[in-house]
Amino acid sequence: RCQYHPKALRRYRGQPSPHGSNPHQIKKGLSPMEHKNCLKKVTAVFSSHEAAPIWKLRHFAVLALLTEIGGELHFILTKRAAGVNQPGDVCFPGGHREQGETLVETALRETEEEIGISQKDIRLLGKSDFMLTIYRGMIQPYIAYIPYEIYKTAVPNPKEVAEIFTVPLRFFLKTEPERHDTVWKVIESPDFPYEKIEGGKNYPFSKSKTTQLFYEYNGHIIWGFTAQVLRNIIEILNESKLKF
């Protein structure tokens, strides 16, 4: 053990103190040997430790699904049903990873559950960049393709999806999103122990500014995480120097 724990002082009459004439004098610090052993143990632990988030992350995956309509690629998007979180928002099929799943398995399963497209009919193309949210979530988008004949068989699960529609890839390639800033700030609970921190109630808690992106297409507002993912996909395509 790294911390030195002396034996309890003998307080019975007639028994000498193990610490000399002063019974309240306690040995402090580590001996050279104890220090060396402690360092070995710390080294053994951290030399093989794999770094991970201090806060446990919730993992999600979505499928940026493409199909071909009239000779050009379209993204398949959904509008969330009234009975789920963020009702009415436009999003990709996807959801929370279940125990034992890989993230790509999550994306494929959720797509089948939400819009009825069989996993065997989906051609996986790759993945775009992932996003870390302020809610301790990690969201991984995957890029995939289905033929138009398969897309026509898509049926929204009414418990989760109100509508399925498509937007041309070309629209996002040629359209700059609107940008609006939001500021996230700390709101302390009523019993927050201000007396324990320097500055008390005047402590300068950090604020976080986030730029929200907005696309509008045929009456649909696409914003939030979905807009961020679409913009990231477009940036990756543009960085490739290929013509689309």
Residue ranges and their predicted role:
Residues 12-20:
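Short, positively charged low-complexity motifs
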Residues 65-67, 77, 144, 166:
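Conserved hydrophobic "DFG−1" position in protein kinase catalytic cores
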Residues 31-54:
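Entry/capping segment at the start of metal-dependent catalytic domains
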Residues 22-32:
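Short, Lys/Arg-enriched N-terminal segments with co-localized hydrophobic residues
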Residues 96-222, 231-232, 236, 242-244:
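Unchanged
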Residues 52-75:
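Conserved N-terminal beta-strand and adjoining loop/helix that marks the start
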Residues 73-97, 101-106, 111:
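A glycine-rich, hydrophobic loop/mini-helix early in the fold
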